[in-house]
Amino acid sequence: MAVHAHPDDEALWTGGLLAHLSRRGADVRVVTCTLGEQGEVIGEPMQGLIADEADMLGGFRYRELEDSLRILGVNGVHHRPCVLGGVGCWRDSGMVGTPSADHPRAFVKSGQQAVDALKALMSEFCPDIVVTYGPDGGYGHPDHIRAHEITHAAVAELPHTSAPELGGDNTDLFSAVLARRHGGRETSADHGIPDPVVLWAVRGETALKQAGRAISRIPDGWVAPSGMDFSFVDGAAGAVDSASSEKTPDKITEPDLAFVPDDLVDLAVQLSDADIEAQANAMAAHATQLWIADGRQSWTNPESAWAVSDPTVAPKVFALSNRIAQPLMREEHYVVAYGGSGPWAKTTPARYAYDSSVVRARGRSAFSLDQADEGAAHDTSEQSGQRR
């Protein structure tokens, strides 16, 4: 189960892992907490959907979410969105300090009701693994932080029956997921759920910077992220070294792209070409929010964009509405935050920070999911023909 704040987060933060596990036969559920009503819009045709005008962006993004879930192969055979509390229950709170956080349905005000709603979904689905963001929400968005809070609260409040064994090489973490559909476990809210492993989606510093340096040219009008030591080329403007001409080195306090130190990354999941393609297509389904620089167009955003990068390191380049160029990496990074049994178990939630008080997680361990689950008992998903 992946618990995400807005439509598009499932593809952007966890799309590679979700697509791969689905393709290999795991039952994958994405829970979306809001409809992203406060988002900006890429492309001129749909600008009128934003909250300050028609305020219809949430419904439009619901449809984009449907397409993304279908591409990733998750949320059952019909790939229907699972919106926490039901469609329209909670609203996008907007960025820090914006008036939208005062809306009576703002997700930051969801309280125990949101925890109870997530507990009900977990009791029904009985996940072995729960994926969300770290305590900072990945980049500080209030809804992402709230998703983290309710995820840990729900896991803590539900009764548990057992914990998946985590082997020293961490491959058993994903074997447990693939075995789940064959195990026939009977669980309920009364008897408890298997003690799930909680993962936080992050990006490790070295891999992100290496992928960024693999980009040699970005589209006209896009900008390079500040604080990352990248030097891209814009076909019209020449070298682009910063996300804003107003940002001089003495004004830059934080990088534009969020990352964590390498030693906080527990899992560096290597993605196949099929995983990357599924993730990129799922991201492109959110055309009002994400722009893939591979020439594709949509009726939402009819303007094409092209970037040049080393596909062995950064197979795609994308941007949000701010047009800051980012690499789509060949691996996804996760912190094992809580749960499980065996050598990798964590009985208290992990924490990460950028100061000496951080509770250090184990060092990075890269592996291929294809290799990790070769020969898994009853695993016939490679022959299932499931559509990507």
From Swiss-Prot:
Protein name (record): 1D-myo-inositol 2-acetamido-2-deoxy-alpha-D-glucopyranoside deacetylase
Annotated GO MF terms: N-acetylglucosaminylinositol deacetylase activity; zinc ion binding
Protein family according to the UniProt entry: Belongs to the MshB deacetylase family.
Presence of the UniProt keyword Phosphoprotein in the record: no
InterPro entries xrefs: GlcNAc_PI_deacetylase-related (IPR003737), LmbE-like_dom_sf (IPR024078), Mycothiol_biosynthesis_MshB (IPR017810)
EC numbers for this chain: 3.5.1.103
Cofactor comment: Binds 1 zinc ion per subunit.
Reactions mediated catalytically: 1D-myo-inositol 2-acetamido-2-deoxy-alpha-D-glucopyranoside + H2O = 1D-myo-inositol 2-amino-2-deoxy-alpha-D-glucopyranoside + acetate
Function: Catalyzes the deacetylation of 1D-myo-inositol 2-acetamido-2-deoxy-alpha-D-glucopyranoside (GlcNAc-Ins) in the mycothiol biosynthesis pathway.
Keywords: Hydrolase, Metal-binding, Zinc
Organism encoding this protein: Corynebacterium kroppenstedtii (strain DSM 44385 / JCM 11950 / CIP 105744 / CCUG 35717)
